[in-house]
Amino acid sequence: MERIAPFKLSGPHTLAEAAALFAATPGARPIAGGTDLIPNLRDGVGKPPMLIDLSGIAALHALTITSAGATIGAGVTLARLATDDQIKRALPVLAEAALTVAGPGHRTVATLGGNLCLDTRCVFYNQSEWWRRSNEYCLKHGGDVCHVAPQGKQCHAAFSGDLAPALLVLGANVEIAGPHGARHLPLADLYVEDGAAHLTLGTGEILVAAHVPPQPVNARAGYRKARARGAIDFPLAGVAARVETRNGCITDLRVALTGTNARPFLLEGTDELVGRPPDDDLLTQLAKLVQKQVSPMRTTVTQSNYRRQVAAVLARRLTCELAGGVVARPTP
């Protein structure tokens, strides 16, 4: 771990002030909780001339839930998400996902926006500067080789945020502010499958809030993750699901994944499983969909095929639990 390169620190009080600072300081980075950014800076990942502290912008701390849906500011801490009574009643999957992130100390300062915009990770990238230099810089650090897939020219660093899959199954969209004004887009469109540049945020743009539409009365949602230890660690694979049932059959199914690809994503093909009971045949088909669509690479200390199998089993078990099904233990 190295000494952090010198930088200026500024604390705007409005979104307009923040936009002006970004426009005036090329290369500036936003900071809120800093639980991911600061360790990366200590490892020499990036040397921004300025950190723009967003924690003083009141608009980013809004948390409102009405019959029209929920608005959750990007500055809302994960500890607040995990314990807020409104969230636990209306959107318990968000509280559940927030509670899995890191440890209690991290969650008191880590924010929703930071988790949604979490940098992608790879064992060949998240190392000290001397380690990266001695092993040849990778694509994500300005080099010309991906150590995970040396024959390719795409970075495969994995996205490891826990809140994104939960918000994806809830149908959330995000509000973004920048030098050209505000815009809204589906959360899925915030990401692309490129580990070196996985966010679609433009220069000077910041995440303002996530907006969640009202949820069906009969919908149940949950989040599960696998990690090396029972706390602190990023997901090797994480799965969120939202299930609607009627008369013993699934009428709607959404599944989203994290930790396996360069972006969190909604599983495709689940519409073909609706109208059926949550039996072993349906859950086996669901597991096969997961195995086909995840793309884990050797970006963690575990084997990629293990993460593929784990993601499928997590999706199967969680869907079964939410739908009230009873099936035999799956064989990967």
Predicted features along the sequence, with ranges:
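C-terminal structural segment of proteins
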Residues: 1-332
